[in-house]
Each structure stands twice: as structure tokens, then as C-alpha cells.
Amino acid sequence: TDSVTIVHNAGQSNQLSEHRLDSNRNHFMEEVSAIAFGDWHEEFDYQFATAQESRNTYNGQGDPNDFMGPALWPSSLSHFAEENQDPGGLLGSHIDMLHESPLGMGIAHDSENVYWYYDGYYGELVRYDFQEDHDTGEDDHSDGKVRRYSDVSLTRVPGIPGHMEMNHNNGILYIADTGAGRIIWVNTDGPGVTTNIMGDETQMEPLAEYSEVTGVEWGILDSGLSFPSGIALHQGVLFVSQNGNGKITGYNLDDDGKGVTRSRTVSTNAGSIMGLEVGPSGKLWYVDSQNNKVIRIDPYEDTDFDEVRDSLDVYPNNSLLWSDSDGDGYADQS
């Protein structure tokens, strides 16, 4: 719907939601697929950026021209979808956009106005730096810096986002590579070889930098998944949703973030599970696209990972000897 639904006081008794549509959404938010919040801005509050699964047809009004990529927005509710909403004026409330990646499937914030982007059209990872925003509704993008990480091959599945998550403590970026059925990690702080590709046919506008980066460190965290889509990181656990079977897996990560010490999977009744996020209270939320719902999971503590909650487990730290298979509140002995 090229729009944003804002849920206020989520999960509370006074919860309410509103639906906002920007006047220029048919380009700047056409077929929006993913969202990532960034740094605080004294005028715009926390800025956020969106990915668009579009080749830029202005909602079917024209032939695709592939002039598409990430858009930057203000989260301030006095700016977003409020400024420049009259026809014939400035270009809505967006505050920047770059256009080298049609069919965007995922996005993650790095720092300042730098975002990582899942380029579904060219099938690779791209780093976008908007640098200074151009203010609401303007169109000067010439200070943008774009780097294509061509070693990181990604496979798009139409209609299923491949979300991304950055660990800001160590620079490891996690990507749901949906079509390949895997979760990959990329060391964004590691070395690489940068080549100037200014003037390449994939460049769609004047830029301050356009380059290709090769030789980066990356790897596979897990594979054999059924269309992984949502992804969220919380206290050393990476949560991943699988659109193909409605399951969510939590991966306890190694100290370096490149491997897994253990994992657990739960099933949901989602018709088409997609995005994940951990809220301020530490509870996991997921999107069910088919049923048009946002669902919260209220977890229980299970220190020993024996699938018996600590409140019912007589010996919660010993998963080899104790469990409560009949749910009577007493430990089984075997």
C-alpha cells in the first residue's frame, strides 16, 4: 500500500494505530518492503530509511526504469506525511533518496546516514551513505556515496522481504538470504579492495562516490531454511523467521558473532510470517502479512533449554536429569 502503519502504546490497554500515506509515495515508498531506524536528528527525531521492492513504475503509471533505491524519512510525526502534501509543490516529506538498487528487499542502519541494502535486482549487498540529507521534499542527491559488495550474492523471492540486522558492537551484518534459504554474516569492519566504478551502467544519478568492494570476509550462519525473512538481534541471540513454514529460530551466537552455540525453534500460526523486532520490554514481535497482523510473543525463562519453564522446573540448571513432561509442576526422574 506504499504506506506506514504506526502503532502507539503497542501492547498496552490504550493501544491505537494510524495509517499514513505520503503524497509522493508512488516513488519514494512504492512497494515498501523493509524499514530501519537510524540516528537522532534535532529536527526530524530518529530518521528512518525504507527499502522498496519496485523497479519504479509510479504504481503502474509508466514502464519500469529502475530508478529506485533506499529513501530516508523523518520519524517526527509533525513532518512525516505532513509536510509538502499538496500537489505541485515539493516532493512530499522524504528527506533523501538514492537510486542504484531496484527491487530492494531489506535494509539495516550502520551509523549516521549510512545504511546497508539488499539489492534484489542485481542480487548483491550495497552500502549507501546519504551523507547530509537534502531536507523534506528536495531532490539533490549528488553527495551520496554508494559501494557495491559484489562478493555477497543474494537471491530475491518476490513478495518476501529478506531483512537485515547490524550488530553495532562488532560490525557483523546478518542477512536473510531468502531465495538461498540461508542466513549469512558479513564483517563490515574488515578489509576489502575498493574499485572506482563511476560511470557504470548501474549508476543512475550524479554521486560523490560509486565503487565496488571485493575481498570482504563473510560466511554462512545457517542454511536449509524455508524462505528466511525476518531477523532481529537481542542480547546475543539472533531471531530468524521462516516464511515457508511459520517458524522462528533463536540462535545463541558465538562471541565473534560468526557461529552458533545452540539454537531453538518455535512454531507460530502465522499465515505468512515476515518481519521481526524485539520491543523495549524484551518481547519479540512478528508480522503476519497474510492475516494483516502484528503479533507479540511473551517468552518464559528456560535457563537449561529443556523446554520446561524455570518456574515449573525443579532443577532449572540441569537439563540432562530433570524435566516436567506431564506438566504437573514436579520434576521427572530418569
Locate predicted features.
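Blade-level signature of beta-propeller repeat domains, shared across WD40, Kelch, NHL, RCC1
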Residues: G271-E301, F305
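Beta-rich, blade/repeat-based domains predominating
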Residues: T1, R25-Y46, H94-V114, R148-G171, ...
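Short, conserved, GDST-rich strand-edge loop motifs in beta-rich repeat architectures
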Residues: T50-P70, Y128
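Extracellular calcium-associated, cysteine-rich motifs in secreted modular proteins
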Residues: P299-S334
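Short loop/turn segments immediately following beta-strands, especially the blade-tip
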Residues: I6-N14, W73-D86, Y128-H141, W185-L207, ...
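Short loop/turn segments immediately following the C-termini of beta-strands
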Residues: T1-D2, N9, W40, A51-R55, ...
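Asp-box/WD-like beta-propeller blade repeats and closely related beta-sheet repeat scaffolds
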Residues: E30-S33, Q61-A108
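Loop/turn-rich, solvent-exposed surfaces of beta-rich toroidal or solenoidal domains
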Residues: Y174-R182, V186, S211-D255
